């Protein structure tokens, strides 16, 4: 039996391994783990053995028959070649002589060893002692294989792999237990320099709408790329890069591509995660090679998508590798604009024809100054501060949530579909607050699907109740559908159907119900359709809101003509619950066309230290990115309660953060604040000073005239619900039961009276009931109680004396 005796514990193992090998003639090397798996599948008694222990036995059996896995032989050959470079030829010859003297039967193997050790039978000559010394060095090299791998990252150069053609007669089928042994391909080190190459961008500024202000800022930052000589006269280093941030889907990557396309400069683009590797030191090497590639192709623009994935804050990084990657990015950015290495003076001297001598030096901005790095991220606060300092990503360009005008411009760029005559882009822009470019693109795509379904149902499925068809009817409809699909593709056949295949306004309305805008994905609410016409009464409060928020946006020129500061103001709406404070805030945002962020007080509270403050910063940052914007804090008393002396709890920290954001060093710019509360007496006094919440408006209980207006607006002038001919709003408003009713109570009154009218029509089979009558309102008024008790009404009357609007006293004559 070749290789020695069998296994005492399992004499049949070695013959079975040999039998398995004979199944694959021509195969030279086998993997022990694959052979062990095949044997366990063939022989049930091996399935009960531990796979790791059994694999060791199979490995020993393969070693006995001198068939070691190719990976192990490759390692030995690699080690031998490495040592050949440093050892003398006589020592290697002595080792070969010594190996020839050693018999093959003298190999001693173990279950853990990957290669057998040889037994020395010759005398100890000088050459043999040198050979043994060489073996010790090889063993030492084995134990230090991890360090050798890292060393190769910095010493070996990646060479393009050359495909080798294999003759057909030499191609053999790979058995399950055979080693594939593919040629070693270069890993991620060479991937950046070999596969990432500059390319042209076909996106230009004209393809992006609503970002003219940002484009103007980019042109100032990229001046050195198009006019390097002009910029060099300033004698300052050019900008190395900037960060583009905004909510997901706002067009950050497309914006960066448009910069390269408009300036006609090649770009290098890749996701930041493509640089991440599991081998220590490889990620840093990829970054270095990427920046070297950018320098070699200067001028160019380097785009790193989602840069926060590889550049998190170092103080919160969980692994040391993340800190090293951030440090490497900082170093690579610094090296973009560095003076070149000093050359010998003789290489810098030039002699003219007239005998003059001049010193020619390279421009310090010649190598990497033509590289502009653009990083995109949805979380700028998550990027390490070292990258955001001056000299690196010192500029940040915000692409916030577009306003109504910007949305209309975006729709003009992306809407290439066939629209019906009743559709205008201005209408769609007004119905899509909180939508970014990707959301608008999805809306158009969804509206097209709705139009296709509508036309399809009209042409093919004539029956409107096709969802309740029987099995035979479904089969018949399916045959009709297939016949239409397999017919001639003639679009003119649809011209008779409502003017052809067009997207109507109704299609957009149906599509709006299925698309979730970016503002809602971020946790912020939007206001689609609340206007002053939907709000009854509250005339004085509406006037104050218009002068504080509406006119500074719509009549900014008049403010400037009189020299009035147009700074954003804050309003605190207080009063009993249900009087329309939230509706007022929504209507203000809708009338101005501004973005609207609704924040309920408890939503920002978090049990973890620092998370509540971070949520406040996020809200204000989103508002600044989407300015002009209105932030509405509902139940603001839960956010900013009064602080006691010396308090240092989480609530106090949250109040401090909110105070800083409201009136900090940076300012709010065009961010308006509206707060609503039922308890202004427990709100911290620092919030109520001018500059934060400038005015306090008390929203009182509606009077009789106010109740008439609320009833008329809530019923859409008697159309929703349908009202009877005997309805008199003044009579209803004067009912004694309605004393102390709020606007929400009146809405509940209308709903209850509608249900009573429906019950009379359905349960009593009284088809003469065509709408809600006076008797239904009277019965509903007797059932509903006011939401604010008498004791609470007295408290709000006292609050009105403190915070209510003071009436101007007439001048004395």
Swiss-Prot record:
One of its GO terms (cellular component) is caspase complex. Residues 158-172 have a biased composition (Polar residues). Residues 97-131, 152-193 are annotated as: Disordered. One of its GO terms (biological process) is negative regulation of apoptotic process. Transmembrane segments: none annotated. ATP binds at residues 246-253, 575-582. Disulfide bonds: none annotated. The keyword Nucleotide-binding applies. Pfam families: AAA, AAA_lid_3, Nucleolin_bd. GO terms for molecular function: ATP binding; ATP hydrolysis activity; preribosome binding. Probably together with ced-9, plays a modest role in preventing ced-4 and caspase ced-3-mediated apoptosis. Found in a complex composed of ced-3, ced-4 and mac-1 or of ced-9, ced-4 and mac-1. Within the complex, interacts with ced-4. This is Protein mac-1.
């Amino acid at each position: 039996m070749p290789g020695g005796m069998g296994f005492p514990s399992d004499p049949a193992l070695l013959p079975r391994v040999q039998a398995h090998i004979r199944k694959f003639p021509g195969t030279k090397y086998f993997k022990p783990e694959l052979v062990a798996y095949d044997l366990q599948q063939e022989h049930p008694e091996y399935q009960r053995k531990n796979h790791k222990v059994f694999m060791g036995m199979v490995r020993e059996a393969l070693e006995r028959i001198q068939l070691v896995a190719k990976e192990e032989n490759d390692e030995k050959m690699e080690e031998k070649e490495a040592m050949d470079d440093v050892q003398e030829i006589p020592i290697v010859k002595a080792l070969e002589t010594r190996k020839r003297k050693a018999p093959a039967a003298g190999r001693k193997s173990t279950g853990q060893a990957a290669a057998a050790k040889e037994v020395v039978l010759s005398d100890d000559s000088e050459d043999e002692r040198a050979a043994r010394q060489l073996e010790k060095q090889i063993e030492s090299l084995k134990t230090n294989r991890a360090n050798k791998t890292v060393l190769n990252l910095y010493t070996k150069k990646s060479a393009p792999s050359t495909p080798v053609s294999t003759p057909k007669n030499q191609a053999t089928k790979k058995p399950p237990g055979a080693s594939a042994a593919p040629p070693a391909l270069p890993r991620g080190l060479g991937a950046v320099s070999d596969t990432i190459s500059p390319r042209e961008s076909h996106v230009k500024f004209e393809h992006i709408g609503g970002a003219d202000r940002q484009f103007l800022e980019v042109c100032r930052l990229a001046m050195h790329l198009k006019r390097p000589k002009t910029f060099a006269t300033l004698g300052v280093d050019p900008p190395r890069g900037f960060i583009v941030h905004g909510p997901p889907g706002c067009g950050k990557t497309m914006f960066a591509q448009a910069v390269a396309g408009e300036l006609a400069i090649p770009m290098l683009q890749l996701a930041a995660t493509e640089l991440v590797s599991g081998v220590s030191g490889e990620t840093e090497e990829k970054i270095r090679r990427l920046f070297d590639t950018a320098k070699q192709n200067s001028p160019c623009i380097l785009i790193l998508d989602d840069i926060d994935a590889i550049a998190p804050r170092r103080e919160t990084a969980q692994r040391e590798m993340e800190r090293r990657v951030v440090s490497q990015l900082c170093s690579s950015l610094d090296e973009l604009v560095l003076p070149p290495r000093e050359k010998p003076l003789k290489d810098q001297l030039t002699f003219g024809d007239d005998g003059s001598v001049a010193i020619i030096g390279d421009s310090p901005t010649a190598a990497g100054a033509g590289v502009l790095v653009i990083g995109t991220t949805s979380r700028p606060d998550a990027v390490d501060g070292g990258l955001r300092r001056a000299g690196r990503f010192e500029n940040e360009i915000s692409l916030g949530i577009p306003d109504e005008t910007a949305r209309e411009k975006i729709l003009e760029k992306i809407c290439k579909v066939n629209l019906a005559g009743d559709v205008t882009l201005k209408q769609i822009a007004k119905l899509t607050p909180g939508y970014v470019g990707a959301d608008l693109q999805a809306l158009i795509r969804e509206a097209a699907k709705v139009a296709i379904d509508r036309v399809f149902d009209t042409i093919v499925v004539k029956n409107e109740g096709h969802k309740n068809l029987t099995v035979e009817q479904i089969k018949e409809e399916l045959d009709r559908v297939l016949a239409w699909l397999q017919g001639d593709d003639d679009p003119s056949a649809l011209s008779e159907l409502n003017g052809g295949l067009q997207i109507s306004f109704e299609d957009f309305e149906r599509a709006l119900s299925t698309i979730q805008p970016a503002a809602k994905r971020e946790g912020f609410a939007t206001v689609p359709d609340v206007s002053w016409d939907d709000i009854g009464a509250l005339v004085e409060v509406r006037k104050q809101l218009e002068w504080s928020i509406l006119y500074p946006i719509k009549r900014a020129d008049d403010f400037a003509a009189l020299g009035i500061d147009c700074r954003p103001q804050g309003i605190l709406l207080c009063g009993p619950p249900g009087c329309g404070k939230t509706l007022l805030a929504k209507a203000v945002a809708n009338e101005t066309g501004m973005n609207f962020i609704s924040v309920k007080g408890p939503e920002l509270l978090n049990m973890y230290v620092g998370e509540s403050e971070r949520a406040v910063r996020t809200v204000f940052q989103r508002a600044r990115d989407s300015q002009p914007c209105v932030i509405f804090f509902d139940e603001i008393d839960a956010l900013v309660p009064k602080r006691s002396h010396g308090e240092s709890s989480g609530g106090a920290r949250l109040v401090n953060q909110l105070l800083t954001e409201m009136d900090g060093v940076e300012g709010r710019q065009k961010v308006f604040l509206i707060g609503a509360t039922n308890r202004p007496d427990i709100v911290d006094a620092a919030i109520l000073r001018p500059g934060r919440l400038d005015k306090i408006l008390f929203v009182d209980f509606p009077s009789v005239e106010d109740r008439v207006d609320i009833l008329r607006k809530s019923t859409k002038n008697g159309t929703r619900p349908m009202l009877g001919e005997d309805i008199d709003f003044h009579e209803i408003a004067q009912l004694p039961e309605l004393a102390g009713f709020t606007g929400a109570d009146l809405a509940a009154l209308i709903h209850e009276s509608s249900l009573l009218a429906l019950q009379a029509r359905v349960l009593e089979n009284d088809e003469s009931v065509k709408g809600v009558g006076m008797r239904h309102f009277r019965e509903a008024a007797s059932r509903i109680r006011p939401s604010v008790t008498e004791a609470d009404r007295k408290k709000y009357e006292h609050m009105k004396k403190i915070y209510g609007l003071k009436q101007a006293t007439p001048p004395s004559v």
